[in-house]
Amino acid sequence: MLTQIKQDAQTRMTKSIDALRHSLTTVRTGRASPALLDGIKVKAYGTDTPLNQVASISVSEGRSLVISLFDKGMIKDVEKAIYASDLGLTPTVVGTVIRLNLPPLTEERRKELSKSVHGEGEDSKVAIRNIRRDANQQVKDLLKDKAVTEDEARGAEDDIQKLTDKAIKDVDEVVKAKEQELMTV
């Protein structure tokens, strides 16, 4: 039973770190990446649809993205969605494709994005600590029901704390790497 609790906590902590990594791929670092546009929703066929479902997105020349729409009649809608996003990008319509040139980030914008990355890291740490709290509560419930001894419970709580420390260290490394990537000109 304790093994199951520890495995569940570890799985949930790993998922939290993976979610942070995925979330940070959408933060603009000066290099073009199709993941930058993951959060953009386009008004298509009456519903908000993710941009990557109505167009193919590719990197061109390192600092620009090319958006090739599946339905050419949606160019205006996609253009509007890009303007509405907080990415600060200006779309250029060239025939049936949209080009996005990524200008170099200003120092002020880099610091702003760095704060945002740091905040997301803190949110992940809070989620990991909540997972630890839940796991420790499950261990305490087992102890209260006399399903485990005090020594087993204390050992399990120590193991859960070690998992938490490792997960928080991983979050710090992910955030630090992203901040370094942001600050590299």
Swiss-Prot record:
Its keywords, alphabetically, are: Cytoplasm, Protein biosynthesis
GO biological process annotations for this chain's record? cytoplasmic translational termination
Source superkingdom: Bacteria
For this protein, the record's SUPFAM superfamilies field holds: Ribosome recycling factor, RRF
- Quote one Gene Ontology molecular function term: ribosomal large subunit binding
Cellular localization per UniProt: Cytoplasm
Q: Which PANTHER family match?
A: MITOCHONDRIAL RIBOSOME RECYCLING FACTOR PSEUDO 1, RIBOSOME RECYCLING FACTOR
Which family would the database say this protein is a member of?
Belongs to the RRF family.
Protein's UniProt name: Ribosome-recycling factor
Q: Which organism is it from?
A: Xanthomonas oryzae pv. oryzae (strain KACC10331 / KXO85)
